């Protein structure tokens, strides 16, 4: 059977918002997570509170392009 075009799920990247603006952090770099999202149910960009290893605390991670 042939597949129907693009599926509803796609892989997205979540990036820490405080890593870019805060020079006083534990280590250099920007923390990123990858996850999947259903574009039919969640049309807006995701914002999740996750642990950032560079800031060493829970911060808001936003979906990137």
Swiss-Prot record:
Output one GO MF annotation. Answer: structural constituent of ribosome
The identity of this protein, by name, is Large ribosomal subunit protein bL33
Statement: the UniProt record of this protein carries the keyword tRNA processing: no
Q: Tell me which PANTHER family the record gives.
A: 50S RIBOSOMAL PROTEIN L33, CHLOROPLASTIC, LARGE RIBOSOMAL SUBUNIT PROTEIN BL33C
Q: Which family does it belong to?
A: Belongs to the bacterial ribosomal protein bL33 family.
An individual GO BP term: translation
What GO CC annotations are associated with the protein? cytoplasm; ribonucleoprotein complex; ribosome
Q: Record keywords: Ribosomal protein included?
A: yes
